Amino acid sequence: MMRIIAGTARGTHLSVPSRGTRPTQDRVREAVFSALQARGAVENACVLDLFAGSGAYGFETLSRGALSLDLVDQSQEAAKAIRKNLAANPAFKEAKLYVQPALAFLASRWVGANPNPQREQVLIE
């Protein structure tokens, strides 16, 4: 089972979709976040997690001090796991789930009448 590695939600177990995703190992996520935090790229960031799967990368950013998180995945199974994870920890209350293709989400946020490109970190896994 996956878990949050560090921060306010450290140790929180995460549900993962049973098929169609291969969650990143804890060691790999720890290395990625070590590099991001060394650059000050997580704390107070607004984060976009495309192809979110379980939401582990995005939830890790919230646990480590990100201000907000948009999770995007078109899979209903992934959305079910993410909703379960959202309910599991109050530290995740700043997250929003969008069940739609990533390109459609980007087009609706960065193209058109009301573009909203204010994201410091975009995670694509």
Label the predicted regions.
Residues M1-I124:
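Class I S-adenosyl-L-methionine-dependent methyltransferase catalytic core
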